[in-house]
Amino acid sequence: MTYRLPFFYLILLILLSSCETLKQSSKYQFIDGFYKTNLDGGVRTIYVLAGSDTIKAYRKSDLGTGKIDSTKAILIRFPSKKPDKFSNLSFNSKTFDVDVLTVLFKYRPPVKDFPPQFNTTFNGAAYFGYRTDVYKLSYKETPMHIFNRRIIHYGYSIGLFSGLGTARIDEYVTNNALSIQYDGLVNLSGIALILAVDKLTAGLTFGEDRLLDKNHSVWVNNAKPWIGLSIGLNIN
């Protein structure tokens, strides 16, 4: 218990301090920038100026070093109410992703005569990955038969994580090599697959724990693989 409570408060502080960053993050907002889209019947990279009612899209070939010719912009009308002619559009952007995450639970396969284990110890980690964000522009019909504008956003990412956590160390998980019980400090690391829907992010993690003290050689779970479910906050 001595290790768990302070570490829990540390993770809680990290997550709460990241909330303001999340509110200011642009990853779940459709803003000016480069995107891939299927305008003109083919996938191409364009630069988007997102206005309140109209979107201006410029081909990369039209972006020179001098003054931009605004007459070459592709105009996409996207007012609050659906215009007479509108086709649903999708825009993709790719960025590097930096998150803080915590693994809610870990499933450990059988090891050294131990049955499968389900662990829920406290932990926190930094995540670095490559992310794709998708923005779908469409209109949704209301019961009053009015079509209102909406932007559906989701993102997905794959990357690596590393951090610190706790693990219960006792005679059972050391094959009676120890006669004491304590919460050991471990380094957790591995690969994560992250899915984001607007502000909510969750991920499937594949990792291992390494005990950071002299008893690592007798801990049956040391450097053994596990599968977990994580939640996190984007900080870039």
Question: Which stretches of residues belong to each language-model region?
Answer:
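N-terminal leader/presequence regions that precede the main folded/catalytic core
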Residues: 2-10, 15-104
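Predominantly the C-terminal beta-signal and adjacent terminal strand-loop region
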Residues: 23, 27, 191, 198-236
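Short loop/turn motifs that connect adjacent beta-strands in outer-membrane beta-barrel proteins
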Residues: 85-95, 134-156, 200
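Residues that define the transmembrane beta-barrel architecture of outer-membrane proteins
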Residues: 94, 118-124, 154, 183-189, ...
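Transmembrane beta-strands of outer-membrane beta-barrel proteins
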Residues: 96-100, 124, 154-162, 202-204, ...
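Transmembrane beta-strands of outer-membrane beta-barrel pores
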Residues: 102-108, 132-134, 162-168, 197-199, ...
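Outer-membrane beta-barrel translocator domains and adjoining extracellular loop/strand segments
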Residues: 110-115, 140-141, 170-177, 215-219
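Outer membrane beta-barrel transmembrane domains
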Residues: 155-187, 192
